[in-house]
Amino acid sequence: MSDSSITMALDMKKGRIRIHKNTLHILGDPQYIQILVNDATMQLALKCIDKPCSGDQCHKTNAKNLDADESCEFYSFALVSKLRELIKEIDAKHTYRLTNGKHVKSHGIALFELSSIEKVES
């Protein structure tokens, strides 16, 4: 099921990943999020996990403690670099948004089509 409120932002210049609070709520306020990229299907997934895992794409969320208008932010130049390899049109100086993520409840993930990435106009 696709949901327009499942969104995230990617700041290519700062290497910042911002997951909107509502996205975390839809995912059940997970303690940790693992960010996965599938090159073959051109998809990005946010996977809910209960314990920290190895690797630089696993992040603590503190989702339940966020204020109403806050987002959860992580920094990962490795992820940003990977996305720039996959999506040639991405400009390293801009911020992009992934919207209409699909909540796959049975797998505890939010799934985004990388083809739907949109540049955020300043």
Regions found by a protein language model. Give the residues of each.
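Short solvent-exposed loop/turn micro-motifs enriched in small/polar/acidic residues
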Residues: 1-3, 28, 96
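Glycine-rich loop/turn
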Residues: 1-14
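A structural signal for short hydrophobic beta-strand segments in well-ordered beta-sheet cores
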Residues: 8-10, 35, 101-103
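Short beta-strand-centered segments at strand-helix junctions
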Residues: 16-27, 76-84
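Short, well-structured hydrophobic secondary-structure segments
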Residues: 18-20, 25-51
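Mature exported/compartmentalized surface modules and terminal targeting/interaction regions
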Residues: 39-40, 45-122
